[in-house]
């Protein structure tokens, strides 16, 4: 007996978060907007999740990296390092 292939329905288009927020240009100093594109673990969310275009995803990723360098946003895994330093 042949197994039936699982068919998936049509995929739902993701809404572009930058357009819905009304942001025209991405700035590393706008941490409130950049936090939307960071997971709870501090990682940059993918295009599939955010619905951004390729160019917008590159701009957001670069802005997040710049904000991390300026200590405006945390690096991923930074909380674990802090907890380890606090607990002897």
Swiss-Prot record:
Q: What's the name of the protein?
A: Small ribosomal subunit protein bS18B
- UniProt-listed GO biological process terms: translation
Provide the organism lineage as a comma list. Bacteria, Bacillati, Actinomycetota, Actinomycetes, Mycobacteriales
**What's in the keyword line of the UniProt record?**
Ribonucleoprotein, Ribosomal protein, RNA-binding, rRNA-binding
Which protein family is named in the record?
A: Belongs to the bacterial ribosomal protein bS18 family.
Q: Does the keyword Signal apply?
A: no
What job does this protein perform? Answer: Binds as a heterodimer with protein bS6 to the central domain of the 16S rRNA, where it helps stabilize the platform of the 30S subunit.
One Pfam match, given by its short name, reads: Ribosomal_S18
GO CC terms of this entry: cytosolic small ribosomal subunit; peptidoglycan-based cell wall; plasma membrane
| Matching PANTHER family | 30S RIBOSOMAL PROTEIN S18, SMALL RIBOSOMAL SUBUNIT PROTEIN BS18M
Q: How does it assemble?
A: Part of the 30S ribosomal subunit. Forms a tight heterodimer with protein bS6.
The regions listed as transmembrane in this protein's record are: none
Per the record, the gene is: rpsR2
- Any one GO molecular function term: structural constituent of ribosome
Q: Which InterPro entries match?
A: Ribosomal_bS18, Ribosomal_bS18_CS, Ribosomal_bS18_sf
State the organism of origin: Mycobacterium tuberculosis (strain ATCC 25618 / H37Rv)
